[in-house]
């Protein structure tokens, strides 16, 4: 089951049951974390138990040079993602006791390096009323929306650059500028 949070950027610790192998069933349960498959960031074994470290669904953490995990989203983007996931989960009427709210979760703001403390709902994978396929579709939809937004922003910037170039008119070659300057000195 999803047992606890890990200090860092949106990490989940998935607790393996005693003797539970990391087999196809387990990976299928975990596949909801990313539409492309399971992204394992590591494995911890100790007195507390055996854990797989995973990213939060829809939030893709990046490892920095010093091995601390920094989320790729800026603070505003991150909160937008959190609200989207929360709203989508509410739409599927998951009972509140199946959500774990952890205000201690910390993200590091890539711009300032300071921690950001959102409250993100974490579905308990094996006790979830929402089916795994439906949750995977939800995560895929969030990723697709992100991609479309990025494409729209790129298109808008390109259109703005073209309009600006039209206002300026065609650029003069520098030789012609120099020739015009000398010819017009009189």
For the regions a language model picked out, list residue spans one by one.
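Catalytic-loop of the protein kinase fold
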Residues: 74, 78-81, 86-124
């Amino acid at each position: 089951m999803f047992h606890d949070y890990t200090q860092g950027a949106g990490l989940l610790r998935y607790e393996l049951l005693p003797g539970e192998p990391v087999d196809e069933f387990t990976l299928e349960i975990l596949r909801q974390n990313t539409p492309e498959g399971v992204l394992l960031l590591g494995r911890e074994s100790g007195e507390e138990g055996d854990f797989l470290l995973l990213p939060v669904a829809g939030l893709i953490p990046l490892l920095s040079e010093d091995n601390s995990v920094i989320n790729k989203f800026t603070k505003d983007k991150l909160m937008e993602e959190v609200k989207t996931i929360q709203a989508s989960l509410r739409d599927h009427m998951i009972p509140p006791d199946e959500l774990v709210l952890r205000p201690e979760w910390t993200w590091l703001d890539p711009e300032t390096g300071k921690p950001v403390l959102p409250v993100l709902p974490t579905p308990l994978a094996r006790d979830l009323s929402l089916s795994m396929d439906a949750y995977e579709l939800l995560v895929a939809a969030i990723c697709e929306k992100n991609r479309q937004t990025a494409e729209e922003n790129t298109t808008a910037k390109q259109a703005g650059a073209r309009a600006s170039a039209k206002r300026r008119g065609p650029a003069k070659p520098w030789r012609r500028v120099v020739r015009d300057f000398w010819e017009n000195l009189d």
